[in-house]
Amino acid sequence: MEEIRISDYTATKVSDTRFGLDAGTMFHMIPRALWEKKVRPDEQHRIFIGLNCLLLRGRGRTILYDAGVGSKLNEKRRKIFGLDPTATLIHDLEKAGVRRSEIDTVVLSHLHF
């Protein structure tokens, strides 16, 4: 797991899943010949972006910054965004050695879904 130290806190990147967005929408006016050197779209013209959250631990606190997509989207929406049902934030938190019950603060920076 990727971790960095920030003052008295350890910051760990934890992933929920990845999601697909229309490549043309994402890159807008950038020519495909340029962006396709770095990323290849799938057959539905989507590029996939990691949906990552930040786990902060320190000073006796465990803070989760953003909470991923969750499990409430219906199958149609999950398919549209190409969400992997086997990748979950809970799984990555467990890999980081954290149980849900240990998180005392959740910060939601913005809402997408």
Language model features with spans:
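Metallo-beta-lactamase
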Residues: 1-95, 102-113
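Alpha-helix capping at helix-to-loop junctions
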Residues: 95-99, 112-113
